């Protein structure tokens, strides 16, 4: 008799996705971040659900409802800080996952990659709205600055911003709708994740060599289930160290001051995971130009397949492009640092140079290096 997991309509899908799935025998720990992102999403949805049970999305009570969660709700402080720091862990895993895809040429799975780019935008939108909900100073002014960027759109900009605000400034209507969107988006993300995996399972996983691995597959369970569990344990350890010992290290102290439209904080800046994009936005003196650069800084991921010039898939055997890749990583760290600095000399210049470098490396240098490597290896025909 065949096992029920291979026959049952629902269990069969789970079986073919997580148990009997043929996986390459040589995928490294860089392939762990997909499952870690799944765990992050589950943690965020569960902690978020429990927070939503006690949170009120009205400007007069939002700040005090978060205080109430931390002080009066059983383990409310734990749920709140797991949710806040869980977002940071989510983005760390997201950046590493995307970086892995860039390094090993996973973007050649076009459908999977494009859904992934949409997921990056969806997760960023969710996080941006989540940071508004506690209704502290940085919540209010962050929401004001970010929504105001849309006013740079010619002709319809101002109308669009006021439509999103639900009035002439960030106020009650804005907070309520941001809570609604922040609640619904993770479920849309979950649906997109299913589509992401659906497309991935059409082709099978990439692997560090970049070669076809059909000749050497192993079952996902037990080999990669146990490997994923190790990754999950490490992720939870890091998350709990953050939550229990340094819960506010990644937050902004200004957000412990209730929102006040009459008092602007000295330095308005987003959460750390948006700082690189914020630095690119600020590096262009023109408002519309900055917004375009901001969007392109993420959207550029979508054109990576078009910029691939090498005859090889990944960077495993390509030292020149490898060097450029790690310079790009260092450049992103510089942008992140600049995004958190005030707009003054020398930070303005450093930010502009780092922004130019970011686009130059991806659009010009890496494709050129790919062609050079083809010639060096005589892969010319």
From Swiss-Prot:
Heme b b566 binds at residues 97, 196. Gene3D superfamilies: Cytochrome Bc1 Complex, Chain C (1.20.810.10). Its cofactor is heme b. InterPro entries: Cyt_b/b6_C, Cyt_b/b6_C_sf, Cyt_b/b6_N, Cytb/b6-like_sf, Cytochrome_b, Cytochrome_b_C_euk/bac, Cytochrome_b_N_euk/bac, Di-haem_cyt_TM. Its main location: mitochondrion. GO terms for molecular function: metal ion binding; ubiquinol-cytochrome-c reductase activity. It comes from the Eukaryota. It holds the Pfam family Cytochrom_B_C. This is Cytochrome b. The lineage of its organism: Eukaryota, Metazoa, Chordata, Craniata, Vertebrata.
């Amino acid at each position: 008799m065949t096992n029920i997991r291979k026959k049952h309509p629902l269990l069969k899908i789970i079986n073919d996705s997580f148990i009997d799935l043929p996986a390459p025998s040589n995928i490294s720990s860089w392939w762990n971040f997909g499952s870690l992102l799944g765990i992050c999403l589950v943690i965020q949805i569960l902690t978020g659900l429990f927070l939503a049970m006690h949170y009120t999305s009205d400007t007069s009570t939002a700040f005090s409802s978060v205080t109430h969660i931390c002080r009066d709700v059983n383990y409310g402080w734990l749920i709140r800080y797991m949710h806040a720091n869980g977002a940071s862990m989510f983005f760390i895993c997201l950046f590493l996952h995307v970086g892995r895809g860039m390094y090993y040429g996973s973007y050649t799975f076009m459908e999977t990659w494009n859904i992934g780019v949409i997921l990056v935008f969806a997760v960023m939108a969710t996080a941006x709205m989540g940071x508004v909900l506690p209704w502290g100073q940085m919540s209010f002014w962050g929401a004001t600055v970010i929504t105001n960027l849309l006013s740079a759109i010619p002709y319809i900009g101002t109308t669009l911003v006021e439509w999103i605000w639900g009035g002439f400034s960030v106020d009650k209507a804005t907070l309520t709708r941001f809570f609604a969107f922040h609640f619904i988006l993770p479920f849309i993300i979950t649906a997109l994740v299913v589509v992401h995996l659906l497309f991935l399972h059409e082709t099978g996983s990439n692997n560090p060599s970049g070669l076809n691995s059909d000749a050497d597959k192993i079952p996902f369970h037990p080999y990669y289930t146990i490997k994923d569990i190790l990754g999950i344990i490490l992720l939870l350890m890091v998350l709990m160290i953050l939550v229990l010992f340094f819960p506010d290290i990644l937050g902004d102290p200004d957000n412990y001051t209730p929102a006040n439209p009459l008092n602007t904080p000295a330095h308005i800046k987003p959460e750390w995971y948006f700082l690189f994009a914020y630095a690119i936005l600020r590096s262009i003196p023109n408002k519309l130009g900055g917004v375009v650069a901001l969007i392109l800084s993420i959207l550029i991921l979508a054109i990576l397949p078009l910029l691939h010039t090498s005859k090889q898939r990944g960077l495993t055997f390509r030292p020149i492009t490898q060097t450029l890749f790690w310079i790009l990583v260092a450049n992103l760290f510089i942008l992140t640092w600049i995004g958190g600095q005030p707009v003054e000399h020398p930070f303005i210049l450093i930010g502009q140079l780092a922004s130019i470098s970011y686009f130059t490396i991806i659009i010009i240098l890496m494709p050129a290096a790919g062609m050079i490597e083809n010639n060096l290896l005589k892969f010319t025909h």
